[in-house]
């Protein structure tokens, strides 16, 4: 069998990198020639993780076919618009994910492992256990980091009942204190001062097709929402430019306070009435407070989907 690429979504976060790195390692232990690659450079949080566990960043690829690869495995995503550029020209043979299934179609049967847990890394951990393969320290560290990132250190409503035990076991294997390491890791991802507005709105962004509309939903983590809002003018300029150049109908930016577990929603586009309806708030100067919201997957995208489909 020829080489298989394993990768997470575009604009990869710690779970996209961690789950693909871990699953590629597992596949190699099972006799498959698999390489973890990335669809973008790691963000600052993930760079902290890679440095902490002395792991080289996976190489960034633009397409699979240009690398001579015809089969791919997706982790932490399934929607084609979030995947590799030539996704429709290669065979998807596996998916390991914890998101909704949408805009996904294959010509051949495949293995799909979908679970409503806190992270794709949680699923990969279970697959190691099921195959009786030992998890080395670096893999444990990256899987743990993916789980911490996606659940905000197990505080997000996306946290599954099984996730705390998974986190404790991975922390033990990685040789770290869960709380101390988790907080340091999350804080590493909140250093936004060096980012341009264009970079800021693209750190962790995904496009969703909602009733024929291409809606971009981005999220940045911070310890002070006001610091981000102080740059509102330049952020809005970057958002409007992104809308125009990419054909988005709307752009929603979640500015998430990781210490107090709240978000400010900044929204621009042609359907702001639907966005207001989704969250039962009124945008003032294009933004509004969303108490208790920290999860794009559970507290933003489902609400937008329902509102746009009415």
UniProtKB/Swiss-Prot annotation:
The record lists the organism as: Streptococcus thermophilus (strain ATCC BAA-491 / LMD-9)
Top-level EC class as recorded in UniProt: hydrolase
Protein name (database record): Probable manganese-dependent inorganic pyrophosphatase
Annotated binding of Mn(2+) 2, by residue: 15, 76, 98, 150
Cofactor annotation: Mn(2+)
Q: Which residues form the signal peptide?
A: none
The protein's annotated catalytic reaction(s) are: diphosphate + H2O = 2 phosphate + H(+)
Q: Name one GO cellular component term.
A: cytoplasm
Listed PANTHER family: BIFUNCTIONAL OLIGORIBONUCLEASE AND PAP PHOSPHATASE NRNA (PTHR47618:SF1)
Binding-site list for Mn(2+) 1: 9, 13, 76
């Amino acid at each position: 069998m020829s080489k298989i690429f394993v990768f997470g979504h575009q604009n990869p976060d710690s779970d996209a990198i961690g789950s693909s790195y871990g699953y590629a390692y597992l596949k190699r232990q099972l006799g498959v020639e698999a390489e973890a690659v990335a669809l973008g450079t790691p963000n600052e949080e993930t760079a902290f993780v890679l440095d902490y566990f002395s792991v080289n960043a996976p190489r960034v690829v633009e397409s699979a076919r240009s690398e001579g690869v015809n089969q791919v495995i997706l982790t932490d995503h399934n929607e084609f618009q979030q995947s590799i550029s030539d996704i429709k020209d290669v065979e998807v043979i596996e998916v390991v994910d914890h998101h909704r299934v949408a805009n996904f179609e294959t010509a051949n049967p495949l293995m799909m492992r979908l679970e409503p847990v806190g992270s794709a890394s949680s699923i990969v951990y279970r697959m190691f256990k099921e195959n009786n393969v030992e998890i080395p320290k670096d893999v444990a560290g990256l899987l743990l980091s993916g789980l911490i990132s996606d659940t905000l250190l197990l505080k997000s409503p996306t946290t599954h009942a099984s996730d705390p035990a998974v986190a404790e076991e991975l922390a033990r294997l990685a040789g770290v204190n869960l709380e101390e390491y988790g907080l340091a890791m999350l804080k590493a991802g909140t250093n936004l001062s060096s980012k341009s507005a264009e970079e800021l709105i693209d750190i962790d962004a995904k496009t969703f097709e909602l009733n024929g509309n291409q809606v971009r939903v981005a999220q940045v983590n911070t310890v002070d929402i006001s610091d981000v809002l102080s740059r509102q003018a330049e952020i809005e300029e970057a958002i409007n430019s992104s809308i125009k150049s990419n054909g988005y109908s709307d752009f929603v930016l979640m500015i998430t306070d990781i210490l107090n577990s709240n978000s400010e929603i900044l929204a621009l586009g042609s359907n702001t009435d639907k966005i207001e309806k989704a969250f039962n708030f009124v945008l003032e100067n294009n933004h509004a407070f969303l108490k208790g919201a920290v999860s794009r997957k559970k507290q933003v995208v489902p609400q937008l989907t329902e509102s746009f489909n009415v």
